[in-house]
């Protein structure tokens, strides 16, 4: 968008980066089974101790996401035409602490807002509802609650963690987004898809 997305935050208890790999044979099957990753993303941090998770109140954080996206748009039959690139989004987080568990929301905005599929599906901004895993633990999961438009299916999911050993000061994790349509192979655009996988970090 016009002003660009927020940068990844400069955090004290967590960090992130890119990684790459290539292999000429990744399978025991006959023949060469090549594989490669370019600009994969990772995030890691000092996990919050479970006994230091607050049992009341709330916290707000903000930051950004970096994802690797791939999509196929308005193609038919056996036309491959898959485009791949790296893109970003702004992220705002709210955590609501409870006595036996916590909930929250991740709000993603300006998410790949030039992609025709994401725009048509109304998914340039979406919310993910968070729930702590197995009670009061530093890890949580979430799924998107935003309605997808114009016949698209799919959504977003996250797996994240709270960072800083003594108090939840930062949070990060992985996100995946999937948008798709089903139809006959020879139908124009009927088998379009969009996938994105990456990370987010907030403080």
Question: Which ranges hold each PLM region?
Answer:
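Mature soluble binding/inhibitory domains
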Residues: 1-203
């Amino acid at each position: 968008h016009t002003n660009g997305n927020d940068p990844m935050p400069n955090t004290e208890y967590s960090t992130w980066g890119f990684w790459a790999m290539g292999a000429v044979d990744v399978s025991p099957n006959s023949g060469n089974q090549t594989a490669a990753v370019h600009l994969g993303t990772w995030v890691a941090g000092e996990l919050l101790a479970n006994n230091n998770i607050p049992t009341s109140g709330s916290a707000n954080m903000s930051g950004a996401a970096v994802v690797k996206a791939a999509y196929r748009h308005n193609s038919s039959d056996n036309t491959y035409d898959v485009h791949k690139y790296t893109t970003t989004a702004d992220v705002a987080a709210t955590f609501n602490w409870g006595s036996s568990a916590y909930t929250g929301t991740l709000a993603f905005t300006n998410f790949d807002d030039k992609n025709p599929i994401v725009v048509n599906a109304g998914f340039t901004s979406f919310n993910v509802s968070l729930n702590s895993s197995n009670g009061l633990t530093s890890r949580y999961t979430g799924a998107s609650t935003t309605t997808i438009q114009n016949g698209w299916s799919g959504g977003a999911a996250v797996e994240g963690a709270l960072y800083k050993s003594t108090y939840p000061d930062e949070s990060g994790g992985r996100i995946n987004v999937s948008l798709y349509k089903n139809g006959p192979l020879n139908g124009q655009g009927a088998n379009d898809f969009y996938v994105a996988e990456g990370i987010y970090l907030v403080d």
